UniProtKB/Swiss-Prot annotation:
InterPro entries: Ribosomal_bL34 (IPR000271), Ribosomal_bL34_CS (IPR020939). This is Large ribosomal subunit protein bL34. The lineage of its organism: Bacteria, Thermotogati, Deinococcota, Deinococci, Thermales. PANTHER family: LARGE RIBOSOMAL SUBUNIT PROTEIN BL34M, MITOCHONDRIAL RIBOSOMAL PROTEIN 34 FAMILY MEMBER. Gene3D superfamilies: 1.10.287.3980. GO terms for molecular function: structural constituent of ribosome. It comes from Thermus thermophilus (strain ATCC 27634 / DSM 579 / HB8).
C-alpha cells in the first residue's frame, strides 16, 4: 500500500503556502489566528535549497 506522505515541494506550496492561504476567506482566518498566537512561521517552509 502506498503511504500517505509523498513529499512534493510544489504541491505543498500550492496547498499550504502563503498565497494559497490568502486566496480564501478561511485561509486568511488561519493566518490571522496564527499571527494572534504569535507563531514564528505562518505557513510551512517550502523553499529550502
Amino acid at each position: 500500500m502506498k503511504r500517505t506522505w509523498q513529499p512534493n515541494r510544489r504541491k505543498r506550496a500550492k496547498t499550504h503556502g502563503f498565497r494559497a492561504r490568502m486566496r480564501t476567506p478561511g485561509g486568511r482566518k488561519v493566518l490571522k489566528r496564527r499571527r494572534q498566537k504569535g507563531r514564528w512561521r505562518l505557513t510551512p517552509a517550502v523553499r529550502k535549497r
